[in-house]
Amino acid sequence: MDFTKSGIPGFSVTDSFADVKQRLDIVRAGNDFGFESVMGYLPLDGKRYLMGATQNPMTYDIDSVELRELFKGDTFEGIALGEMSAQEFAGELAKIGSVPIMEDTGIWWPAERVCFYVYEDVPSTICWWGKDPIVDEVKTIFSGKIGELDLNVYHLYKAEE
């Protein structure tokens, strides 16, 4: 499956939370942190992907959509997932969009409002963010104000020499 900047085929962060919730084979729904969230399986292209969505408690729009448990052969904008290190993957993203912001646990692609969570130095989860994120740190990342972040944790992608 080739995932894109705009989201999961058939889903968008501009969809209503209720519509997204209806399309999942729900494993867990909750109101953990004062906002609603749901996690469930989404059948796509003959596979069952684990997908989560959180709701913005102020606007009731989708805050984020997350896709876990990627499969061999999955790609993002044509870039192979699971076959390269986080640094190499960030380099490929930089070729087709904004310069990623790196941290130990993730790759943030600010202009595209996408992040990739990293497990054992390999991108393993894709997360698309809505227009009004609720977490201040995420707001800062997507505003492009990296100087306001802890520079011991975050840094702009730079090609290895």
For each feature predicted by the language model, list its residue ranges.
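Conserved short beta-strand elements that form part of the metal-binding/catalytic scaffold
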Residues: 37-43, 47-57
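Non-cytosolic coordination micro-motifs
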Residues: 1-44, 62-161
